[in-house]
Amino acid sequence: MSSIKIECVLRENCHCGESPVWGEASNSLLFVDIPAKKVCRWNALSKQVQRVTLDAPVSSVALRQAGGYVATVGTKFCALNWEDESAVVLAAVDKDKKNNRFNDGKVDPAGRYFAGTMAEETAPAVLERHQGSLYALFADHHVEKYFDQVDISNGLDWSLDHKIFYYIDSLSYSVDAFDYDLQTGKISNRRSIYKMEKEEHIPDGMCIDTEGKLWVACYNGGRVIRLDPETGKRLQTVKLPVDKTTSCCFGGKDYSEMYVTCARDGLDPQGLLQQPEAGGIFKITGLGVKGLPPYPYAG
């Protein structure tokens, strides 16, 4: 077992950092700060950060095949032009639910942008329940709705053979799997593959490694856990020096580094003193596993 090293590479003080995505072309980590309405890009070589502020909470960001990025902003799927800091609306959802916003999102292996919604929180993880839905933005900009009655739509990824879709609705305290049809994007046969332990708290963002194992960030649990989706067993726990770990992705030149986002909102003054790096970006090396490059949106 290689020795694991955890370092805070950027003290960004995110209110709620989320959606880390490695951009290979720019050697950068993209991420968002949801309540600050910001998309950020941290260059791993220069250590510089560029920030784009949008007009609504921005909850996820993804690469785009045609260049630039796509993001979920409020209840809209948007194309993001980094150079002029502009966002163009591609589609909108939940028009009848004024209190909703998007949460986590990710692009599937066929280039569809999956993202789910939730009600705005009155405090971290406190909200009107069952208000969210899971959607996907297809390459032709049409949107499909998969299901509703979601509390906090969160982590998502696909198995290495593209036959299983993994999904987290945070307040179910479960990691779920669906059968997945790559050609159509259809999902079916939902089942739970892992129930969170009490000390792991709330399942949040998620990614997959090249061995087909899942990594889940545990909000309020201060850790990422590695799961075997076939056996339902937890294989590994990596604890971080912050409680509110929100999401994770692999990056770096060979995708052997893990990047973890976290939040400072919800910490009291004592918590902030004890966790000065809360809201920062963490890099974990020495895990001994690698991840996959993120898929770009095809539209």
UniProtKB/Swiss-Prot annotation:
Metabolic or biological pathway: Cofactor biosynthesis; L-ascorbate biosynthesis via UDP-alpha-D-glucuronate pathway; L-ascorbate from UDP-alpha-D-glucuronate: step 3/4
Signal peptide region: none
Cofactor comment text: Binds 1 divalent metal cation per subunit. Most active with Zn(2+) and Mn(2+) ions. The physiological cofactor is most likely Ca(2+) or Mg(2+).
Gene3D superfamilies linked to this entry: TolB, C-terminal domain (2.120.10.30)
Recorded GO CC terms: cytoplasm
Name of this chain's protein: Regucalcin
Needed co-factor(s): Zn(2+); Mn(2+); Ca(2+); Mg(2+)
Broad EC category: hydrolase
Organism: Sus scrofa (Pig)
Main localization of the protein described in the UniProt heading: cytoplasm
Modification N6-succinyllysine occurs at: 244, 253
Function according to Swiss-Prot or TrEMBL: Gluconolactonase with low activity towards other sugar lactones, including gulonolactone and galactonolactone. Catalyzes a key step in ascorbic acid (vitamin C) biosynthesis. Can also hydrolyze diisopropyl phosphorofluoridate and phenylacetate (in vitro). Calcium-binding protein. Modulates Ca(2+) signaling, and Ca(2+)-dependent cellular processes and enzyme activities.
Localization per record: Cytoplasm
InterPro entries assigned to the protein according to its UniProt record, in alphabetical order: 6-blade_b-propeller_TolB-like (IPR011042), Regucalcin (IPR008367), SGL (IPR013658), SMP-30 (IPR005511)
